[in-house]
C-alpha cells in the first residue's frame, strides 16, 4: 500500500483524556474525556431514542443521568469493551475516518503489561481492520516533541505518573519509575478536603465539578509551610467558585494543599516518594556518565504538570537533592498537555519511521506477539 498519500492517525489514550488526530498536524483534532457513561435508571427518557452507552463529551454533558466509568485506570486499560467503544467513537464520530484506510499510531504507558499491548494490537487489526499500526511509549514521544533525544521525562497525567530517562531516543527500562499518583488522585483528595469543610461532593458527576475547581484554582506553593501560614493569617489566597446550581463556595488553603500531595504523597496516605524524589531516584538509577544530561534536560509532560508553580518547585526540590555543582534545568513546554500526541504526530510523519509500522500481513503471519518485536 502507498503510505505516502494516506495520513496516519495518532491516538493518545490517556486515563483522563483521549487525544486524536492526523500525523503531521501540530495539534490533535479531537480531545475528549476517556469516559463511557451508562444510564443509571432504565427508561427514564422513553422515546428519546436513548442509547445504552455514551462516550466522551456526550457522556460528560449527560452526566446527571449516567454512571461514568473510565476504562483506563493508572494508564492501563482495564475494560476492553469500553475501550473499544472509545476507539470506535474516535474513528467514526470524532475524526470521521475509516480505520481500515489509515495506519494507526497508539501510545502506551511505560512498563505496560505485555498482554495489554497485544490486546491493543489485536483489536486494531481484527476489530478495526487497520492496514498498519504501531505502539509507542508516551514519555518518549513527549521528549521528541520537545526537540530532544536525551533527557528525563516526568509525565504525570490523570491516572499515573512516570519518570522515564531517555538516552539517544531509547527509554532506559531499568531506571523507569512509576507512581500511581496523578490528577485523578488529586481530584479525589480535593473532594475529601472540601467535604471536610462541609461541602458535599460524592457522585461521579460531582467529581467532574471538583476536577474543574482543581484545574481553575489550584497551584503549587514554593514553600508549603510558609504558604500555610499566609493562608491562616489572611484571606489573600481565598478564591470563590460558582457551582452549576449557582451556589458559591470559597476555597483557601485547599488550593495548594491539593497539589502538594504530588510532593508529599503521605497526604493521601501513600508511602511513596514525591514526584521530585521519584525523578531524582530515576536519574540515580542511570549510568553516572549520563546523569548530567538528564539533570539539564528534565522535561515535564502531561495535564497534571499544567498546575501553576510546579516547575519552580521541581527546580527547588531537585536542586536540594542533586550535587551542589550540578546544572539543573526543568523544561515545561507550554503545549505539554498534548506533548505526547505532538511527539506521535512527529514520529508517524517521519520518512524513516515508515518501515517501522506493523503491517496487517505481518500480524496475520505472526499474531499479536509481533508487537514486542517491532515496538521495543
UniProtKB/Swiss-Prot annotation:
Main localisation:
cytoplasm
Any one Pfam family here would be Actin
PROSITE patterns with a match to the protein in the record: ACTINS_1, ACTINS_2, ACTINS_ACT_LIKE
Calcium keyword on record: no
The cross-references to SUPFAM superfamilies, in alphabetical order and at most eight, read:
Actin-like ATPase domain
Task: Cite the entry's keywords alphabetically.
Answer: ATP-binding, Cytoplasm, Cytoskeleton, Hydrolase, Nucleotide-binding
Which top EC class applies here?
hydrolase
From the UniProt annotation, give the residues forming the signal peptide: none
Places the protein is found = Cytoplasm, Cytoskeleton
Q: Which InterPro entries match?
A: Actin (IPR004000), Actin/actin-like_CS (IPR020902), Actin_CS (IPR004001), ATPase_NBD (IPR043129)
CDD domains registered for this protein in UniProt: ASKHA_NBD_actin
Which GO cellular component terms, listed alphabetically, does the Swiss-Prot or TrEMBL entry include? cytoplasm; cytoskeleton
Q: Which domain of life is it from?
A: Eukaryota
Which GO terms of the molecular function aspect are on file?
ATP binding; hydrolase activity
The record lists the catalysed reaction(s) as:
ATP + H2O = ADP + phosphate + H(+)
The UniProt entry, under PANTHER family, shows: ACTIN
Family according to the record: Belongs to the actin family.
Described by its record, this protein's role is as follows: Actins are highly conserved proteins that are involved in various types of cell motility and are ubiquitously expressed in all eukaryotic cells.
Protein's name according to its UniProt entry: Actin
Species name = Brugia malayi
